[in-house]
């Protein structure tokens, strides 16, 4: 065997040994990375599970208390699992409140406000973001400034105005003041600005008017923002208590939140957590 052949075989063996070492090192690093990912995912899932539990724990307590006699809810120390269970609270609730009617009123109120406000908010946002006119910046500043006015300061004036129009205890009375929302206008405007204006110009060249551009170009591209505004509108009005409580005093127009509020207090210093307590 020649010296060159021996040298070549030696180099080949050394190369194979080096490749094996590199492969082993890479495999070790991959296993180490997989272990780190597994630990990271496990900790993330544990943290998410803990946060989820903390978020739903109050709801669980509310459900448990609804099946607990009021006398048991006042005991100390409190118990997560009560010693007694009852359905009397639900029986009394359906006897004392027209739950079906109030639930329907809430759906009508929250749904109508959501649809109407999203429509008007998107129209206003389109004008403030895509249409050039004098005073646009001033108008936007004035709208944003109105957000600094406390809502409580407007309750009595708005109530008197609607009362003079005969809209107390009516769907229109609770819906009309919520038909537009400055926060929704601002959010949609900021999203509309991110849509390229080249789309508008191309549509105008094809003969499209402003409303067609708004309906066929802007709205389809702004679905995420519109859904976000709609979701916040619906949830906010569904959970609203003060406005429906002020504007409605009859079951025909009262929402579910206002109806449930009628069950608490009764002039007592102790809240009757079980609705079986009579006023």
Question: What is the predicted function of each stretch?
Answer:
Residues 1-48, 272-273, 277-278:
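Transmembrane alpha-helical segments of polytopic membrane transport and secretion proteins
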Residues 22, 41-279:
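A structural signal for multi-pass alpha-helical bundles of membrane permease subunits
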């Amino acid at each position: 065997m020649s010296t060159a052949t021996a040298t070549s075989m030696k180099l080949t063996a050394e190369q194979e040994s080096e490749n094996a070492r590199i492969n082993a090192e890479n495999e070790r690093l991959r296993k180490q990375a997989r272990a780190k990912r597994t630990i990271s995912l496990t900790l993330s899932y544990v943290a998410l599970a803990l946060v989820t539990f903390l978020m739903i724990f109050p709801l669980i307590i509310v459900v448990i208390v609804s099946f607990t006699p009021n006398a048991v809810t006042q005991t100390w120390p409190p118990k997560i699992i009560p010693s007694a269970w009852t359905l009397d609270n639900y029986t009394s609730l359906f006897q004392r409140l027209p739950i079906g009617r109030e639930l329907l009123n809430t759906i009508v109120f929250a749904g109508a406000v959501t649809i109407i406000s999203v429509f008007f908010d998107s129209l206003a946002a389109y004008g403030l973001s895509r249409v050039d006119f004098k005073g646009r910046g001033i108008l936007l500043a004035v709208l944003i400034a109105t957000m600094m006015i406390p809502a409580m300061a407007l309750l009595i004036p708005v109530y008197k105005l609607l009362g003079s129009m005969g809209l107390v205890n009516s769907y229109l009375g609770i819906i009309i003041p919520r038909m537009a929302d400055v926060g929704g206008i601002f959010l949609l405007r900021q999203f509309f600005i991110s849509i390229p204006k080249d789309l508008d110009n191309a549509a105008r060249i094809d003969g499209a008017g402003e409303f067609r551009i708004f309906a066929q170009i802007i709205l389809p591209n702004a679905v995420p923002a519109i859904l976000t505004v709609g979701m916040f509108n619906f949830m906010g009005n569904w959970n609203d208590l003060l406005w429906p409580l002020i504007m409605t005093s009859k079951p025909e127009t009262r929402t579910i939140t206002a109806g449930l509020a009628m069950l608490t207090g009764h002039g007592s210093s102790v809240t009757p957590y079980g609705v079986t307590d009579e006023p």
